[in-house]
């Protein structure tokens, strides 16, 4: 089904987002609800939705703001969270995830968004979109709440690949710097390399080698390298970009999520403990609400796959309408600034001796 847009905007003004409607834990209803939130806030955003046509069309027809803003592409197969990436690669044609990536590959859409299986999404994205020249391992970058002026730091890799050698870490630094410059409007981002200490003699061999490589590139690439940083700096203001391997990065963000949940639960318990504490919670409510808004993970939901010939945003699998809308907002911003082209130019600008042989 292809709905007529009925809009007065020119074709060039549109940002078309390809959405895997079947990937999330909450099902297509939450994904379509997220599209609805985005459509009401962003009149220049249009959607190609992938999933069983009858089911998706019925959900779209219930949302007034989506009328004339969506094309539904029939895809009856679904990639589940339990599917192994190797199995998905062999049997993915006809799935909503495959179809969503294909829309970026064939130029129908600028960015793909999926709440689905991370490993499968990365595998399909690498196969269908291919890696940028000079990139050995793509990375997943997320915005992590911080005390910096912009409110977030860029953290990568957070799970694309558990291994990373010195050359990979250099490329992560350049890709993360490009993301911070274009996505957070930081003209000269500060980059830190995550380690067990800040002293130059600490850490594994590949970290020490990466230290030298990144340091050499800071002036040619236009960023400031602050050296080694520790786990406490991920949410601090020492740097804007934190570079690490996918194993460490994934543990870091999930530890952060768990800690945030623990603190939230303990606060609720404390405020419910006595009548006086319940009264105090009412007095503190405006401040607590502002705090929640600042650190709400749904506001920055979306990991960006960096290093591919196309932009893919991975939303949290359990995202609700607010979370999906945040991922779509991020996707639209990246499409608007033509981020993939800028990233490709940045990676291609490395001196020949620094590129992967």
Swiss-Prot record:
Pathway: Lipid metabolism; phospholipid metabolism. InterPro entries: FA_synthesis, Phospholipid_synth_PlsX-like. It is an enzyme of class 2 (transferase). It catalyses: a fatty acyl-[ACP] + phosphate = an acyl phosphate + holo-[ACP]. Coiled coil: none annotated. Its EC number is 2.3.1.274. It comes from the Bacteria. Keywords: Cytoplasm, Lipid biosynthesis, Lipid metabolism, Phospholipid biosynthesis, Phospholipid metabolism, Transferase. Its main location: cytoplasm. The keyword Transferase applies. It is found in: Cytoplasm. GO terms for molecular function: phosphate:acyl-[acyl carrier protein] acyltransferase activity. One of its GO terms (cellular component) is cytoplasm. GO terms for biological process: fatty acid biosynthetic process; phospholipid biosynthetic process. Catalyzes the reversible formation of acyl-phosphate (acyl-PO(4)) from acyl-[acyl-carrier-protein] (acyl-ACP). This enzyme utilizes acyl-ACP as fatty acyl donor, but not acyl-CoA. Homodimer. Probably interacts with PlsY. Belongs to the PlsX family. This is Phosphate acyltransferase.
